[in-house]
Amino acid sequence: MAPRKRSHHGLGFLCCFGGSDIPEINLRDNHPLQFMEFSSPIPNAEELNIRFAELVDELDLTDKNREAMFALPPEKKWQIYCSKKKEQEDPNKLATSWPDYYIDRINSMAAMQSLYAFDEEETEMRNQVVEDLKTALRTQPMRFVTRFIELEGLTCLLNFLRSMDHATCESRIHTSLIGCIKALMNNSQGRAHVLAQPEAISTIAQSLRTENSKTKVAVLEILGAVCLVPGGHKKVLQAMLHYQVYAAERTRFQTLLNELDRSLGRYRDEVNLKTAIMSFINAVLNAGAGEDNLEFRLHLRYEFLMLGIQPVIDKLRQHENAILDKHLDFFEMVRNEDDLELARRFDMVHIDTKSASQMFELIHKKLKYTEAYPCLLSVLHHCLQMPYKRNGGYFQQWQLLDRILQQIVLQDERGVDPDLAPLENFNVKNIVNMLINENEVKQWRDQAEKFRKEHMELVSRLERKERECETKTLEKEEMMRTLNKMKDKLARESQELRQARGQVAELVAQLSELSTGPVSSPPPPGGPLTLSSSMTTNDLPPPPPPLPFACCPPPPPPPLPPGGPPTPPGAPPCLGMGLPLPQDPYPSSDVPLRKKRVPQPSHPLKSFNWVKLNEERVPGTVWNEIDDMQVFRILDLEDFEKMFSAYQRHQKELGSTEDIYLASRKVKELSVIDGRRAQNCIILLSKLKLSNEEIRQAILKMDEQEDLAKDMLEQLLKFIPEKSDIDLLEEHKHEIERMARADRFLYEMSRIDHYQQRLQALFFKKKFQERLAEAKPKVEAILLASRELVRSKRLRQMLEVILAIGNFMNKGQRGGAYGFRVASLNKIADTKSSIDRNISLLHYLIMILEKHFPDILNMPSELQHLPEAAKVNLAELEKEVGNLRRGLRAVEVELEYQRRQVREPSDKFVPVMSDFITVSSFSFSELEDQLNEARDKFAKALMHFGEHDSKMQPDEFFGIFDTFLQAFSEARQDLEAMRRRKEEEERRARMEAMLKEQRERERWQRQRKVLAAGSSLEEGGEFDDLVSALRSGEVFDKDLCKLKRSRKRSGSQALEVTRERAINRLNY
């Protein structure tokens, strides 16, 4: 069952809670209303309403009070206004009409209270000052309260309360100071200021430590009323915690229970104090978190019950005071209702919270078959092990356990504590989250890691398939576009061929007519031959179709080695030119070179990358005089083998037997590649995540499955095995299993025929479309921008306007111009107006265009490709096109070579690259045609603007127009901003005039009503009403009635249940 939410309908009559009934205005006595005569006559209605509205604004009234005030007749309004003005102008009150006077006096009183012993007259005067301040805070206009707050008047009062001595604490001054704070809180602005002060409520609570019952009553009324204000309940609980420390209480609220049980001897004072205490207890129990939180009410009420409040309540019944009995009834009724609610949760009629055995049985019954039951047993088991001494030395451990349980019950899901008494900064939710089973967390973590790896693998496979699909799709689309273009080109060439055949037929017919005519003189020797008359058009063979790309000649055969076979007798001389062979510059010798007996190392060594001299070139050189065999006798070959061994060893001294054993078990790796290069190669292979065989198959199949990304191919090109690397690796190919990873990779790649050329062709294929897509927009930008500049009519019209303005402005040699260089366009903005330096000639040009030639303003829409063309560097573009041309040529050469070779079954270089060359050659030829056309159009554009004699590049030429268009657009924005600023200033001026007129009209139109007549304005306020309702118990009237009705219903139901149980027992 959900906890019962408590509401305070009894507060409906209060102004601060929006009561619905407007009280009547009653006179204090039975005398008739006497009008006061004033020297000044009553002004007209409009002026009276304006003056009266100013007065009402000063009084800080509620909406209903304002309505009642404005509903008064004009004579009454004028009487109230004149009386208030007369009070403000009273010369006897000028000194005390401002808060500065009171603040200075109270500060001096606080400073001198411990220095002097004041007599009775001086004490009375000091008390009168505080009383006057209390009255001023209630009766003075709103500006007085505002000024008091601004001058830190509240801080002055709080400091006085903190520093007062015992004599002052027991005097009427203390009561009056609390009254000043209460009067300040009777104002909405003052109340907000008090609640905003962090230590204000705690300082007020400190005043409970006095023997003056009136002071205690005033403090309790303030604290009880603050409980009912939004956000005040928690501040009051914190204030009572502060008072526990301040007054050295054993438990919180101990002083209140002592005062509730103590007898003062004076009936009136005793009843007032006990009523204030009970009203405060009911407010703190049922307001704030107690409105809808059953656990909070049970928790806080249990604190009072443990202090012994129930016997005290029974004792208070003897006073037979109606208001006090109302508070006692409300306390007991709410307690009984909450106990019933708690019992319903356990399907019980009543729970004896004083019986440990009954509470344990209920908890045992509730948790017996739940997962929490082992935890209950653990709690009890560890409670048995808690330290125990007869003298109670371990009370704090049990207190800690109690407070932890209180915190668990009270703290909500957001971690908010309605009461800070149990444990501060103790977040139950965070601790519960930390107590989750670690094994379960580890299990989920392992499973999540497994799923993560599977997910990453699937994502990787999906990405490869997507790349493969995307590549195939792009190739298919490009092939279809190329096929369509080739069809169109074939149709055009067929048309041209038919036209050419028709022209040939006509020419043949003409030749036939000429041959049948008069015989002409024979042609001169060596003249052109004529076609025979029998030759017709059909006899002409058709021209061969154009090849998609030029075939390259086979590579030249390698040159013969120097010691090749001699030329056979009768063979033509070398080079086919009849020239004798050149003599060998190295003379041969008939003395054979001695055979070298080089010592063999015990294991492979690193190689020395030298270029070996041929033996036939040694005679006659210094090498013929050198004998390296003598050096071997001097060298320490064993040390040399250790230093330059091809096996990689760790630089570690093998001193102990364990080191020798571990070293012997390590696998020796053979590495002949440079260390830095090998390390970079290993890093690349780790990024590829492919085996050597997978990389090899991907290269042979031209990366069908898109395993090799473009950036990886670019990196692989940096690790092409060089000839020296291949020679070294070939020497140790019998030890391939011992090779380091980088060495083995380079060795296996070197076994692929034309590995470097294949890799370059594959990389070119992957990058071709991207490079083509980068080059085409640049070519098209130049082409389209050139066309747009030449064809733009609006640009031509604007140049006419600029030429006219320039000829009008310039005289002498600069005047009378027929045209100007295009670079002059960007100098228009440099000419500033003589009247306004913010206006340039460009701004004025736009004004002219807006007024006389508005269509020219749309000129940028005709020149949309200028920004792109201004970024194109023609030299770099032509260089890129040349690189593409050379790349295609290199692929064609490699394709011709691979066609002559015997291929492996998995080698797909020829079919893949043949299709690629077919499509890419056509696309590239189209790009070249576009580039040639763009050059022509650009040259025409230069000539069109008279710049044909200059050597402007496209980026410079188009950049001039692009810069001008940007400046043109910015100038238009500047003009638009100037217009908006001007319009905004005019609109603001109109709005200010309208607002001023509206304020004047509203000042006399506001008609309100008030709760009492003008004379009652000095008495009471909304905070006083709240305190009064709390004191009388009217705050709880609605809830009390509801509880009584609920109690009757529940009592009758309980009676019926008891009867049924008795009958069942008898039947049984």
From Swiss-Prot:
The keyword Phosphoprotein applies. The keyword Metal-binding does not apply. Residues 434-516 form a coiled coil. The modification Phosphoserine is found at S1015. PROSITE patterns: DAD (PS51231), FH2 (PS51444), GBD_FH3 (PS51232). Expressed in most tissues examined. Expressed in kidney glomeruli. Residues 518-594 form the FH1 domain. GO terms for cellular component: extracellular exosome. One of its GO terms (molecular function) is small GTPase binding. Keywords: Coiled coil, Disease variant, Phosphoprotein, Wnt signaling pathway. Changing E121Q: In NPHS24; uncertain significance; affects the regulation of filopodia formation. GO terms for biological process: actin cytoskeleton organization; determination of left/right symmetry; dorsal spinal cord development; negative regulation of oligodendrocyte differentiation; podocyte cell migration; positive regulation of canonical Wnt signaling pathway; positive regulation of cell migration; regulation of actin cytoskeleton organization. Belongs to the formin homology family. Interacts with DVL3. Interacts with INF2. The DAD domain regulates activation via an autoinhibitory interaction with the GBD/FH3 domain. This autoinhibition is released upon competitive binding of an activated GTPase. The release of DAD allows the FH2 domain to then nucleate and elongate nonbranched actin filaments. Key regulator of the Wnt signaling pathway, which is required for various processes during development, such as dorsal patterning, determination of left/right symmetry or myelination in the central nervous system. Acts downstream of Wnt ligands and upstream of beta-catenin (CTNNB1). Required for canonical Wnt signaling pathway during patterning in the dorsal spinal cord by promoting the aggregation of Disheveled (Dvl) complexes, thereby clustering and formation of Wnt receptor signalosomes and potentiating Wnt activity. This is Disheveled-associated activator of morphogenesis 2. It comes from Homo sapiens. The gene is DAAM2.
